[in-house]
Amino acid sequence: MEIIFYHPTFNAAWWVNALEKALPHARVREWKVGDNNPADYALVWQPPVEMLAGRRLKAVFVLGAGVDAILSKLNAHPEMLDASIPLFRLEDTGMGLQMQEYAVSQVLHWFRRFDDYQALKNQALWKPLPEYTREEFSVGIMGAGVLGAKVAESLQAWGFPLRCWSRSRKSWPGVESYVGREELRAFLNQTRVLINLLPNTAQTVGIINSELLDQLPDGAYVLNLARGVHVQEADLLAALDSGKLKGAMLDVFSQEPLPQESPLWRHPRVAMTPHIAAVTRPAEAIDYISRTITQLEKGEPVTGQVDRARGY
């Protein structure tokens, strides 16, 4: 079995060594320009067109949970990868736990009004504030995939009313499920904290805009953990300035790194992190990839395959 690996920043030697230990019968090599030798599987992130073009691969693994970048490249260069070759994304591989940590910590931060207390501290004001009640602090999750399910599971223990919005109906215990555009308004109307975990598709670009934000309760919060292109940043800022939104926590942006001139840097009710909510953890990624390749070789059913038509 031949496996080729390409990532512009990862330590290729470490990955090659780890994969060969996990798959003793495989020969793994770092792909370099000019390497046209046969391969059965490819592990990639931002691969050049020539790496995959013309290869008769059994499968391609994308070294991340998001596949929008490679799908966009495949649309621009259809010769890059035959449509019959399955494409896999990393399914959880530690990202679920990271998303749980991030989402729970931020929801609790807002629920306990730590943002308000920080503002009071900046004014040197000692002023206990009324508490919020859990019943009025409904959390709505847009996107009900693997990561959305993990976040909902982690928030259940804290007793917040939970709801999710997705393409298909979910039957998660303790979570109200809303489906499609026809139920979006009902989902938003009672959502105090909106958590975005949607995939990046043509249908979801710019979805968090003024029309959507206007349907949230006054004083709502937005937590974006998915993609920056989901948010119309000017609309978000306008909602913050008007008081419609009380706060926003952003891990992703329409342009990264975020330009220094962006008003998001200076807005007092915007907090941010530099796209670190859930990063690839190599050891867990190796475990998932080696396990999935073994299942594929045995003809067993696998999970994590990308639906190219849907975009995730």
Swiss-Prot record:
GO cellular component: cytosol
Highest taxon in the source lineage: Bacteria
Catalytic activities: glycolate + NADP(+) = glyoxylate + NADPH + H(+); (R)-glycerate + NAD(+) = 3-hydroxypyruvate + NADH + H(+); (R)-glycerate + NADP(+) = 3-hydroxypyruvate + NADPH + H(+)
Places the protein is found: Cytoplasm
Entry EC no(s): 1.1.1.79, 1.1.1.81
Family classification: Belongs to the D-isomer specific 2-hydroxyacid dehydrogenase family. GhrA subfamily.
SUPFAM superfamilies, alphabetized: NAD(P)-binding Rossmann-fold domains
UniProt name for this protein: Glyoxylate/hydroxypyruvate reductase A
Keywords: Cytoplasm, NAD, NADP, Oxidoreductase
CDD domains assigned: GDH_like_2
Function: Catalyzes the NADPH-dependent reduction of glyoxylate and hydroxypyruvate into glycolate and glycerate, respectively.
Classification via InterPro entries: D-isomer_DH_NAD-bd, GhrA_Enterobacterales, NAD(P)-bd_dom_sf
Molecular function GO labels: glyoxylate reductase (NADPH) activity; hydroxypyruvate reductase (NADH) activity; hydroxypyruvate reductase (NADPH) activity; hydroxypyruvate reductase [NAD(P)H] activity; NAD binding
Gene3D superfamilies per record: NAD(P)-binding Rossmann-like Domain
EC primary class: oxidoreductase
Gene that encodes the chain: ghrA
Organism: Salmonella typhimurium (strain LT2 / SGSC1412 / ATCC 700720)
Active site residues per record: 227, 275
Any Pfam family: 2-Hacid_dh_C
